[in-house]
A protein has these predicted regions:
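Conserved class I S-adenosyl-L-methionine
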Residues: 104-112
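A short, conserved alpha-helix within the catalytic core of class I
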Residues: 202-217
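A conserved beta-strand element that flanks and buttresses the S-adenosyl-L-methionine
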Residues: 195
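Conserved alpha-helix/loop element of class I SAM-dependent methyltransferases that forms part
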Residues: 81-104
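Conserved beta-strand signature within the Rossmann-like core of class I S-adenosyl-L-methionine
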Residues: 218-229
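Short, glycine-/aromatic-enriched active-site segment of Class I SAM-dependent methyltransferases
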Residues: 227-248
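Short alpha-helix
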Residues: 157-165, 248-265
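Membrane-proximal basic amphipathic "stem/tether" segments
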Residues: 1-61
């Protein structure tokens, strides 16, 4: 194999080449034979914080909200929104979640503060189960992350934000402590709709997790994950990040998730348009997300 062929097949070259092509096209302008440009990816930023303290009841809720470091921005009513790192409410219409879940049994995998579980409940679900781990030390993240937690004395139990939102919203969502590796129809039965967001890149065995989710899904599951920009058309590749000072184990290629979901047993998959949802603390950093419907219809 020539040096040129070796370089062309290397992963860095395959990752960089689409970006170089895009830059070249941008500098040179579109050619007469070039394909129509794809529509720009929608970008969503967190809204301004809303923590009014005009009434005694609002003040009591806000005081409780301020005691927690929030991952999700959740509408608690009375004009109060939690100051979450991510605000999924503005782009909510882009997510492929059915508008009407009346009578459905639903599952939220890795619920954290519970935004998606409460949203499924709001859409009429008959039952919502919210899966979570018990402690930060139960996370399946790279070992040096856990060692850092231990050095800093981080043993915090999860679910604090969930319990606050659950109480204020008068919710009936059922939060269960269970690792996704232990998820099974024997323990939980089957679900009409499953939502799983930003989980697979953070665990050692995403295929096993997909298999377990498939086993409890009798209708459809929606997966939302980050992916490598510029990786469309490069095949279902996956690369290891765990030694790069990152809380994720993996970086997925654009086509990995659909192929992995089919390999895990789902009958068919449908991709939805990607979006870019920015973090509150770093609004200038792109956070591209791919969204996939995986369907069983058992």
């Amino acid at each position: 194999m020539s040096l040129r062929q070796t370089v062309a097949r290397s992963l860095p070259y395959r990752i960089a080449r689409p970006a170089v092509r895009a830059l070249r096209a941008r500098l040179n302008g579109p050619s007469a034979t070039s394909a129509p440009a794809a529509p720009p990816m929608p970008v969503y930023f967190p809204r301004t914080l809303a923590l009014p303290e005009d009434t005694p009841e609002q003040r009591a809720i806000v005081e409780e909200v301020k005691q927690h470091s929030w991952y999700h921005t959740i509408d608690l009513g009375q004009g109060i929104r939690t100051p979450g790192r991510f605000d999924h409410i503005p782009p909510l219409h882009h997510y492929p979640m059915p508008l009407d879940l009346t009578g459905k049994r639903c599952l939220d995998v890795a619920t954290f503060d519970g935004f998606w579980a409460f949203e499924m409940e709001r859409r009429g679900a008959a039952e919502v189960v919210a899966l979570d781990i018990d402690s930060w030390l139960d996370l399946d993240v790279p070992p040096y992350i856990l060692e850092d937690f231990k050095r800093r004395g981080v043993t915090t139990k999860t679910g604090v934000g969930f319990e606050i939102a659950h109480k204020v919203r008068n919710s009936k969502v059922d939060r269960r402590i269970c690792n996704v590796y232990d998820l099974s129809p024997e323990k939980f039965g089957e679900f009409d709709f499953v939502f799983c967001s930003d989980v697979l890149v953070h665990i050692t065995n995403p295929i096993r997790a997909l298999e377990n989710i498939c086993a409890v899904t009798k209708g459809e599951a929606v997966f939302v994950e980050g992916y490598a920009p510029g990786s469309a058309g490069m095949g279902p590749w996956i690369t290891l990040l765990a030694q790069l000072d990152n809380s994720a184990w993996w970086m997925f290629g654009r086509d990995f998730l659909s192929k992995a979901a089919l390999a895990a047993g789902f009958a068919r998959v449908e991709a939805s348009p990607d979006i870019d949802v920015r973090q509150r603390a770093t609004p200038d950093a792109p956070m591209q997300r791919l969204m996939l419907r995986a369907i069983n219809n058992r």
